[in-house]
């Protein structure tokens, strides 16, 4: 085909000519930008760029919540000038210092996570438009506010798949700009890297929102459904007598074709399909909008991947993208398990059979001629995976292949342990494997059994063992009874929080009478096993907090039962309500959690969403009690999700490993000048309590995290009843888990009505004796003492431009 050159041509004299114009690059976004400019009440940051939030909002956050850096090392190895020693306030050859370099390191993690979700969204959007067409209406349930994150960043409110495209192009364009700042000789100021990280976090929630709204719409996922079906979860739920197809990753597009093939060929009760990570959550949402009886199952999080493979249960493994182990092919190959890569982001060096014949490909995989293949044609993928699973099952059953040792092999391996401690040093969780091996030598396997839940399945211990003991296999052998009983229930991801739920809870959240929203999200890098998140969720649910979950956290909460044999999903309702446990969905569903906070501002307070992030973030920071928990955070995506919460004024608590992200955002509660805002009624300064006192921090134990999170739900706008309720929970939890009353509780008291009702008199005495407050004991009222005054009609804001005098 000849190359078109610049110029013009005429078709005046041609006959029967048809000209088809498909996509004009950038045209959709340009048209959307022009349309957004026509909005009457839009905020100041339509299609926000790198600098848009910097001065008006980000720097205000960073002034109060100062970055606390935790470098992993003192060197910079970015370019060929290096490596440069940045210790002792030295600068590198390019001029950057440790602060700037560390800011860049954290920022790089955030944009990596943002890119991951954005690419996920792009893949789904393109595939679903190709399959269902651009005109498919977005259907997320009974809501009018469908896309709060898209709207807050761009001003757009898409109603169809096609109308989502400009928002996708916007995220991709800004990601390119952000990535460019990482290059040597670009940004060097730590505070500006933090500002850019916050901006990237906001983009991450747009990318996640795109991913979930298009799949909820096209795949008939539950739509804001508080009674979505309960799904079986755990390794013990797999029927070993049936062929088993195991899917791993986060992008469910290809898996839907496998499920369609199973249903078309009446195989849903003749084989097992189950998953790990968020693909597992989303495959159990597929076609569940009408609450049909589910047949797909969830095994668990990334920490279970190697454990499941070593068990020998899967007959075929299919991977897509994100949080997939890098050693799946060699591990599966040892056990005759074919591996099929269904997404170009993970191809493992496998031969590409996308254009090959289905029968020939199945024969290559069945015979072991190739260990696996790349298959990007989803129609073929669905057929190959199901047929291959049915064919591999009898072959593998006949061979009896498993990595789990026999009783004799188990004893021999245990006796080989030299108690050198190398495994414990290598273990990310510092598990006392030598101690467990010592007890096993004496016939007590309970210590190894306990390690099963605490072990994250990384096999670092095996690689340093001088005796070449397959330590993971030993642990799994000892835990066989526990594994067989690992049967829980998880509510299928329900999707967005509906407008009706926001109207019902908005007032309670802003006034403080609903104590807060606790969002349990993130990965499985827990310091002491998965049950930590169960304990945390149960504590807050019993205290009438709204608990929302996604991803690995949602799975792990469903793994455990009470003395009556019920999981938390069975014990508590699935709505966005006081004492409700709402599984929102997979990782990309996290956008609906920030979306819920944004919808409180939009629906309850009638604040403009369009291009108005700073005002919405200001509203949430001052009025909506919410705190995130990523107790096992390990990935770059976790850092971008958390940072996206931070820019909206939502604090997050991370587990002890998360200091490796290199940065926290912590305020100094004793710097009184940092705890002043404007009263929007008149522009006058007003003092507020130090709440929340961090945006991003870590805790050492789950017992420390619980009171920390309860405190982080206190907000300046709480009314007396709300403040009293929140102080009650915080002080009780502090006493329960840390053994004492918090030292700074009095800083949050504005008058006697703020005090917990049951202990009001005792606390008034303490205020008088310890802090010099004047108390009218006849009326039991505070006469003087508080530095913070209570005014029920005050309108706290950090933004001077929102004041009436402005």
Swiss-Prot record:
Q: Where is the 4Fe-4S ferredoxin-type domain?
A: 407-436, 446-475
CC cofactor note: Binds 7 [4Fe-4S] clusters per heterotetramer.
What's in the keyword line of the UniProt record?
A: 4Fe-4S, Iron, Iron-sulfur, Metal-binding, Methanogenesis, Nickel, Oxidoreductase, Repeat
Q: Where does CO bind?
A: 117
Q: Which GO terms describe its biological process?
A: acetyl-CoA metabolic process; methanogenesis, from acetate; response to hydrogen peroxide
Binding positions for [4Fe-4S] cluster 2 per the UniProt entry: 76, 79, 84, 94
- Report quaternary structure and partners: Heterotetramer of two alpha and two epsilon subunits. The ACDS complex is made up of alpha, epsilon, beta, gamma and delta subunits with a probable stoichiometry of (alpha(2)epsilon(2))(4)-beta(8)-(gamma(1)delta(1))(8).
Name of the molecule in the record: Acetyl-CoA decarbonylase/synthase complex subunit alpha 1
Which species does this protein come from? Methanosarcina barkeri (strain Fusaro / DSM 804)
* Encoding gene, per UniProt annotation: cdhA1
């Amino acid at each position: 085909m000849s190359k078109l050159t610049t110029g013009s041509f005429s078709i005046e004299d041609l006959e029967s000519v048809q000209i088809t114009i498909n996509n004009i690059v950038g045209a959709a976004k340009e048209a959307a930008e022009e349309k957004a400019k026509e909005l009457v009440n839009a905020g100041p940051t339509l299609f926000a760029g790198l600098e848009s939030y910097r001065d008006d909002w980000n720097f205000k956050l960073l002034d109060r919540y100062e970055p606390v850096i935790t470098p992993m090392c003192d060197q910079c190895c970015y370019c060929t000038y290096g490596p440069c020693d940045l210790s002792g306030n030295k600068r590198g050859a390019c001029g950057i210092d440790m602060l700037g370099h560390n800011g860049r390191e954290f920022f790089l993690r955030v944009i990596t996570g943002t890119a991951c979700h954005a690419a996920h969204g792009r893949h789904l959007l393109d595939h679903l438009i190709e399959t269902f067409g651009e005109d498919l209406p977005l259907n997320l349930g009974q809501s009018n506010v469908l896309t709060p994150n898209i709207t807050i960043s761009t001003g757009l409110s898409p109603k169809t798949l096609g109308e989502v495209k400009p928002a996708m192009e916007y995220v991709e364009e800004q990601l390119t700009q952000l990535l460019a700042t990482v290059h040597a000789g670009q940004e060097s100021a730590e505070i500006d890297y933090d500002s850019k990280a916050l901006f990237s976090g906001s983009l991450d929630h747009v990318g996640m929102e795109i991913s979930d709204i298009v799949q909820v719409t096209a795949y008939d996922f539950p739509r804001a459904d508080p009674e979505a079906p309960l799904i079986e979860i755990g390794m013990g739920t797999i029927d070993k007598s049936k062929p088993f197809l195991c899917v791993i990753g986060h992008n469910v597009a290809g898996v839907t074709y496998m499920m369609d093939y199973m249903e078309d060929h009446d195989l849903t009760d003749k084989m097992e399909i189950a998953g790990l990570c968020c693909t597992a959550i989303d495959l159990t949402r597929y076609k569940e909008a009408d609450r049909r009886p589910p047949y797909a199952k969830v095994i668990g999080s990334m920490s279970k991947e190697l454990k499941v493979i070593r068990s020998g249960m899967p007959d075929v493994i299919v991977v897509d993208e994100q949080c997939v182990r890098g050693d799946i092919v060699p591990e599966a190959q040892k056990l005759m398990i074919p591996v099929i890569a269904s997404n170009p982001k993970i191809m493992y060096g496998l031969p590409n059979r996308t254009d090959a014949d289905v029968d020939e490909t199945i024969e290559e995989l069945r015979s072991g001629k190739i260990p696996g293949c790349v298959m990007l044609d989803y129609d073929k993928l669905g057929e190959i995976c199901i047929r291959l699973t049915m064919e591999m099952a009898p072959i593998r059953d006949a061979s009896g292949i498993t990595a789990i040792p026999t009783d004799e092999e188990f004893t021999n391996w245990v006796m080989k342990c030299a108690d050198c401690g190398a495994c414990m040093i290598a273990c990310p969780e510092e598990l006392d494997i030598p101690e467990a091996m010592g007890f096993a030598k004496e016939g007590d396997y309970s210590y190894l059994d306990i390690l099963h839940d605490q072990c994250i399945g990384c096999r670092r211990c095996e690689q340093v063992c001088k005796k070449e003991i397959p330590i993971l296999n030993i642990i799994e052998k000892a835990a066989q009874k526990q594994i067989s009983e690992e049967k829980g229930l998880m509510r299928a991801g329900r999707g967005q929080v509906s407008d009706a739920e926001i109207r019902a809870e908005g007032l309670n959240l802003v006034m403080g009478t609903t104590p807060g929203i606790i969002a349990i999200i993130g990965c499985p890098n827990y310091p002491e096993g998965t049950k930590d998140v169960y304990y945390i969720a149960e504590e807050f649910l019993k205290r009438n907090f709204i608990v929302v979950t996604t991803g690995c956290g949602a799975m792990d909460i469903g793994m455990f039962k009470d003395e009556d044999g019920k999981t938390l999903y069975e014990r508590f309702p699935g709505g966005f309500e006081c004492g409700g446990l709402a599984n929102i969905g997979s990782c990309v569903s996290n956008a609906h959690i920030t979306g819920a906070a944004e919808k409180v501002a939009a629906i309850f307070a009638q604040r403009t969403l369009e291009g108005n992030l700073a005002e919405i973030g200001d509203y949430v920071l001052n009025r909506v009690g919410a705190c995130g928990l990523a107790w096992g955070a390990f990935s770059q995506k976790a850092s971008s999700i958390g940072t996206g919460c931070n820019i909206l004024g939502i604090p997050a608590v991370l587990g002890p490993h998360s200091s490796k992200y290199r940065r926290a955002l912590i305020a100094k509660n004793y710097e009184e000048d940092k705890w002043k805002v404007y009263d929007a009624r008149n522009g006058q300064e007003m003092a507020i309590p130090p709440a929340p006192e961090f945006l991003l921090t870590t805790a050492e134990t789950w017992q420390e995290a619980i009171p920390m999170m309860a405190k982080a739900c206190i907000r300046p706008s709480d009314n007396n009843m709300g403040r009293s309720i929140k102080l009650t929970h915080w002080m009780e939890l502090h006493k329960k888990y840390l053994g004492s009353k918090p030292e700074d509780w009095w800083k949050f008291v504005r008058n006697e009505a703020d005090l917990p009702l049951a202990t009001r008199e005792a606390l008034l005495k303490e205020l008088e004796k310890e802090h010099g407050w004047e108390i009218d004991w006849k009326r039991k009222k505070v006469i003087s003492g508080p530095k913070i005054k209570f005014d029920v009609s005050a309108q706290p804001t950090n933004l001077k431009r929102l004041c009436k005098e402005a």
